[in-house]
Amino acid sequence: YWTDVFNKDVDGCGSDLDEYARRLLICALTYGHCHTLVDFPAPSGARSLAEERALNRRPYWIEVDPTNVYGWRLDREANYGNLTQVRIGEKAVVPDGEFGEKVYDQVRVIEPGRYRVFRQEEQKAEMQGPFPYPASFDQSDATAEYELVESGDFSLGQIPLVTIYANKTDTMTSKPPLLDIAHLNLAHYQRQAD
């Protein structure tokens, strides 16, 4: 059952496994690594596996850009290198009236067996570019107030985040594999411009 479902729709948005893997590869080549977070919909009251399948409740994969991973903690004692916490920046689009929407910065904090979501209290006023979403997170705003808007537990005893490396330097860090070529191209074009 799962093989057929994941081959057709791995992320809950209609992307098949090939398309999803292609996006991860592009991200890993760009940044040196990328992440996949495995999530599961909130409980819906289904009482059997057949009911869950009828409601299409199943795990799905979320591509996490490395620039949105704000920080992490590793177990340095018992199980060296295992994640004990990860903080992921997200955008929350909240309905505002009949037709409007508000976009908030939020941070998802995931630890083994539990998660919390903190949302910035004030909506970002400036929108950049032709899209209705802010272009990037403003991590420099240390005075921003965040409030806890969601929390919960899950039965998995570890953080469901998988990191794919193209050029690993350490846990959760890497060097973009094409960076040297980019610098060489830049130097070439600068010499040609003179």
Each model region followed by its residue ranges:
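Extended alpha-helical, oligomerization-prone segments that build pores/tubes and scaffolds
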Residues: Y1-D194
